[in-house]
């Protein structure tokens, strides 16, 4: 079980006139797929970096299972937008790298790495050099590396942002498949409305200046996809389209319509 608890969290960078985050309250329960949606500059990455332990908040706190987050830890895996792979290593050694630093023996870490590569559909590419892979395949390696340590929580920092549209759709389906199989707790950030709607079991909408959580909504679309395996049908449903229109308006600062209030 893993519960992330964020209370009154704020971050003000040195020399900044406005806080990057202020008064953020959020609780993420075990097995949830929570997506933070917002425009650039609303503090999404700052919030994720606090959860990863890369930066310390200047106010409030973040806890995992009741323990304050103070620095990076193996219980929190991170997937970056830029793949952050080691080009001189092959695929399996990239995936096993974190296990090596944890003192896991070579045979066991390679066994775990192969199992994790199979989870993301790359078991046939274990010996390939990462620079020879496409962007989508490199990001699969990044996801496998984050999963190899069996973290309680997976933190994903706009991992599809650098991919072309078709590859991005494929990766979204892969990430949902991995979540469906592992039921890892996932915190995922994006500025794509459609991506947020498709992936999230719960969506939090962030607003800038300073960054705050403005809204939180439970969504059915991730589970609909896992039940049907038909992404096109999910994304073309009237309910999905209504939500997309609603969130686009909210990101542009427009008030709720009467129809949207009824949808809530």
Swiss-Prot record:
The keyword Phosphoprotein is assigned to this record: no
Gene3D superfamilies linked to this entry: P-loop containing nucleotide triphosphate hydrolases (3.40.50.300)
Uppermost EC category: translocase
GO cellular component: plasma membrane
Keyword Secreted included in the entry's annotation: no
Subcellular location(s) per record: Cell inner membrane
Keyword list, A-Z: ATP-binding, Cell inner membrane, Cell membrane, Membrane, Nucleotide-binding, Translocase, Transport
ABC transporter domain sequence ranges: 6-233
CDD domains in alphabetical order: ABC_NrtD_SsuB_transporters (cd03293)
Annotated ATP binding sites: 38-45
EC number: 7.6.2.7
GO MF terms, alphabetically ordered: ABC-type taurine transporter transporter activity; ATP binding; ATP hydrolysis activity
Transmembrane segments: none
Membrane topology qualifier: Peripheral membrane protein
Major subcellular site: membrane
Catalytic activity: taurine(out) + ATP + H2O = taurine(in) + ADP + phosphate + H(+)
InterPro entries cross-referenced by the UniProt entry: AAA+_ATPase, ABC_transporter-like_ATP-bd, ABC_transporter-like_CS, ABC_transporter_ATP-bind, P-loop_NTPase
Subunit structure: The complex is composed of two ATP-binding proteins (TauB), two transmembrane proteins (TauC) and a solute-binding protein (TauA).
Function: Part of the ABC transporter complex TauABC involved in taurine import. Responsible for energy coupling to the transport system.
Protein name as it appears in the record: Taurine import ATP-binding protein TauB 3
Organism: Paraburkholderia xenovorans (strain LB400)
Lineage, uppermost ranks: Bacteria, Pseudomonadati, Pseudomonadota, Betaproteobacteria, Burkholderiales
């Amino acid at each position: 079980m893993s519960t992330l608890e964020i209370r009154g969290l704020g971050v003000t960078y040195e020399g900044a006139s406005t806080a990057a985050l202020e008064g953020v309250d959020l609780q993420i329960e075990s097995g949830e797929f929570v997506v933070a949606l917002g425009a650039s500059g609303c503090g999404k990455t700052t919030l994720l970096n606090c959860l990863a332990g890369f930066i310390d908040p200047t106010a409030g706190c973040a806890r995992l299972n009741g323990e304050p987050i103070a620095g990076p830890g193996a219980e929190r895996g991170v997937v970056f937008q830029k793949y952050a792979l080691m080009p001189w290593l092959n695929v399996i050694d990239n995936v096993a790298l974190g296990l090596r630093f944890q003192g896991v023996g070579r045979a066991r870490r390679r066994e775990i790495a192969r199992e994790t590569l199979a989870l993301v559909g790359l078991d046939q590419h274990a010996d390939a050099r990462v620079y020879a892979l496409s962007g989508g395949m490199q990001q699969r390696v990044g996801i496998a590396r984050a999963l190899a340590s069996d973290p309680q929580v997976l933190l994903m920092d706009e991992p599809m942002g650098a991919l072309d549209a078709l590859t991005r759709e494929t990766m979204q389906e892969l990430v949902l498949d991995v979540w469906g199989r592992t039921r890892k707790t996932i915190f995922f950030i994006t500025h794509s409305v459609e991506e947020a709607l498709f992936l999230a079991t719960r969506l939090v909408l962030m607003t800038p200046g300073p960054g705050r959580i403005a809204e939180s909504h439970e969504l059915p679309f991730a589970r609909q996809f896992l039940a049907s395996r038909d992404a096109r049908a999910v994304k073309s449903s009237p309910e999905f389209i209504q939500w997309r229109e609603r969130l686009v308006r909210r990101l542009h600062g427009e008030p709720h319509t009467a129809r949207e209030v009824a949808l809530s």
